[in-house]
Amino acid sequence: MWRIKIAEGGNNPYIYSTNNFQGRQIWVFDPNAGTPEEQAEVEEARQNFWKNRFQVKPNSDLLWQLQFLREKNFKQKIPKVKVEDGEEITSEIAAAALRRSVHLFSALQASDGHWCAENGGLLFFLPPLVFAVYITGHLNTVFSPEHRKEILRYIYCHQNEDGGWGIHIEGHSTMFCTVLNYICMRILGEARDGGIENACERGRKWILDHGGATGISSWGKTWLSILGVYEWDGTNPMPPEFWAFPSSFPLHPAKMFCYCRITYMPMSYLYGKRFVGPITPLILQIREEIYNEPYNKIKWNSVRHLCAKEDNYFPHPTIQKLLWDALYTFSEPLFSRWPFNKLREKALKITMDHIHYEDHNSRYITIGCVEKPLCMLACWIEDPHGEAFKKHLARIADYIWVGEDGIKMQSFGSQTWDTSLALQALIASDLSHEIGPTLKQGHVFTKNSQATENPSGDFRKMFRHISKGAWTFSDKDQGWQVSDCTAESLKCCLLFSMMPPEIVGEKMEPEKVYDSVNVILSLQSQNGGFTAWEPARAGSWMEWLNPVEFMEDLVVEHEYVECTSSAIQALVLFKKLYPRHRNKEIENCIINAAQFIENIQEPDGSWYGNWGICFSYGTWFALKGLAAAGRTYENCSAIRKGVDFLLKSQRDDGGWAESYLSCPKKVYVPFEGNRSNLVQTAWAMMGLIYGGQAKRDPMPLHRAAKLLINSQTDLGDFPQQELTGAFMRNCMLHYALFRNTFPIWALAEYRRHVLFPSAGFGFGFTNNL
């Protein structure tokens, strides 16, 4: 039986931590764990998911929840409530519904104070990790038979009815993910026509019917070349020499978005080495299975730019293709010959130095799941028996997640982000007298998860930004500062500082608060908006270089409405509590940030959400940020337009439901069907509350609250529905905790501001700056 372990490093000499592994969550298989009843409960969850996999594609993340509730012997004691048609929602009904969810949510807190959750749903995350451990000869040591069984379960569960796999679990089939998952099944032991319901045969048929694997997108071409089932001559150049150029060079990686930079760092190393893994009998078989012509007859140079239409969300512009052609024709032959091959050797060393630096400063977690197997493989190529590779192996467990739909690879964990939102939802409930220990533990976790140092050495030379005082998206060890994670965690600490210490613990030291504010301020751009990870270092013109066909806006850092809103909220509250610290600078920062939010509003009154689906998410953040900055419905046309957008998109059942297609299409697309999405309903509901809807006409809020209350389960949680997370326009994420966090938060705000409208928003002040 699978069990999750919290804040454990084990006895592995190759793993280390900056904060005693707080926030770390790893899964282990214990064949002796669980009673027959508990094992049956898990199996029932698996079977229920399988039967309904085409209706609700994200899993409910039940395995760890079943474990926690058993360990804490949680029983729901508060009776379920229901609002009948024509019935008024009383404070007693709202309080009962809220208390049911809050008590359950508190029982789901981990022992170190954070909340666990899956953060995944992308179907290109896991196969490269399997490829990497296969190439290095560690497949059987990293993945036990139980691991392999659950990985295959996940692949089977998320195969589309047409036989292919999408970029994400709700997406249409693509060549990229179908080829990757087909090969993954073969490596894990399935025969060419094997798998549940002939998964391999159906997957291969999809590949061949859509032109074969030569049409795989660029990341796929890279991984297939590494694996030995494609040729490097069929990929566009990724010269490591770019890392050897002065950072003033217009196309230097230092100017790129951190994820783009650190993905292409090991890719360029592998490309420069022309590395190919062992050509095993299985690799030779796969070569003959995924193409429509014999492998040795393929003209690799002619397929460099080929991309299946299903994958080609961001077609390469002609000027980009000309650049790749020039590099392929002129520079690559040059760097393979003396004396220029000496320059390549130097560039490879510089690139490897950067890989080691990033590995060290993330405790070998790396910045994310795309980069992890690439960096690990580069370290193995340099020294198969070296410490760096062994440290990478020790951190694979940080990425593995087990649900009722099988084993998947996390993006890299959302522990800090999820916890900061969960704590704010619980604080808003005004039930601190009932859940004091939960709040205290969460407060301790948040304080202990703050970064206390910048990256090591001359970090600016390594193109890194300050991190001292920041919070990451996952845990402290991962090390990468994020503006909104910092702002939301700082808000938690500031809110706790206003509460009785005997309930929530001692407040954070002022110097650490100042460090956090310093990080937030450092990430504001000249246009007033806030970036996520690093300051914007280049203009948007560089996006024409985007080599990734299925994503957009990933070459350089951009400003985001969500990050800007979070920063405003944190700084407004900080300014109230610490009015003398950088007062004028913070005041100007808030003014410019609020203006940025107004400036990027869509003509229909909405805001595009970058990290959630989509206009519902962005509009909630925008309205909350503007309200924090002192804007009101009466004095701000942007708020009036935003409120109007939300009211117009409310559905007959009182809720909201937006399709994930809004993200790639960049226009509001309603969800097909009659059912509303409860998480999006919570976002819209809170957006209306911050827009002052309660005092004008509370009926839309009553209708939304009725839907949330009546959707609550017998246990006290809320049902899993469609995906709600997003990134890079075309990739959707499963934030499994959101199904509880946001309905709780919305009901809490409804109870405070609609049923008891005298309550303030908690921003510190609401007058105009």
Swiss-Prot record:
Its EC number is 5.4.99.41. It catalyses: (S)-2,3-epoxysqualene = lupeol. One of its GO terms (molecular function) is lupeol synthase activity. Expressed in stems and laves of glaucous individuals. Not expressed neither in stems or leaves of the glossy phenotype, nor in roots of both phenotypes. PFTB repeats lie at residues 148-189, 513-558, 590-630, 639-680. PROSITE patterns: TERPENE_SYNTHASES. GO terms for biological process: cuticle development; pentacyclic triterpenoid biosynthetic process. Oxidosqualene cyclase involved in the biosynthesis of the cuticular lupeol of glaucous individuals, but not of the glossy phenotype. Lupeol forms probably the thread-shaped epicuticular wax crystals that hamper insect adhesion and can prevent herbivores from climbing vertical plant structures, a phenomenon known as the 'greasy pole syndrome'. This is Lupeol synthase.
